């Protein structure tokens, strides 16, 4: 996929694969230490790399730059175009870089796993799968599940929604430490649900209070790596599923958690239907002011990424967001320090203090959820 480019034929996008592609690693050597001179230099390189305009017809759709300091510290900045990669792909890229680094240190050159398939095999499989009876049954599931869903579900806005959606955004983050993570995992185990289901339940409780609506539709990304061998491939496999929940005051937290468990399992079982096919089948009327079906996203990632290589340690640093595809995106990552929770939001719709207050209530529900699991939603303060 890193040798893949895109062009148009008869007005339609077509991918092609080059036998060889040129790649140059950008390099900056700094006479100083990272904690002093380094931060601005790294920030400047990040801004340069993140705003790089890819030519889709000139692979690789990857840009990288290494900043090295005289004391041996450094920063590797990588930008992968979204057409060729997803979060799982980034995990694979880091994993393979680790393997290659350690192999150079050890002198073992044959370390990368042999791939049993390529991305083109997946696209051929997907095109064939969409002609099957099984696919049609899965599509019918989604048509039934989302029939009559709200045309737009979102957090009430501070500013008027523009006639044409723009993607300007900002973000706000909180940390939940390991003690909180352990407590939530224990609670999930006792209730026989996943940590994701617990987090999503808390998020929907807060949304139901803020919106005063009882039909809540949230999008969540799924890895969608059901094709054999896709777990080892860099490429765009990610899909989105819509988790719809009926929420009413008489329900208990336990009731909602069980409903979300059932709906989530069904969504996972039907995750390989491309979201755009669902939108198309529902005949959703397009609106330039908002996205179809989903304007609130909830994402949970727990991919295991080690932070040690032979001879040194590293950490992954993500630049602050300045865009937002959705009105609201809650992105939670589990790591060795706990849960990193980021709320990415449309800055043209919401004030920062609105988002901070919303996230504060979300954190409060997470803190209390084991104690209030049998309480009716109407009684939650």
Regions found by a protein language model. Name each.
Residues 89:
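Receiver (REC) domain switch/active-site region of two-component response regulators
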Residues 5-10, 14, 28-33, 40, ...:
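Adenylate-forming
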Residues 373-381:
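A Lys/Arg-rich helix-loop hairpin that forms a DNA/phosphate-binding surface
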Residues 17-24:
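Structured interaction and signal-relay segments at domain junctions
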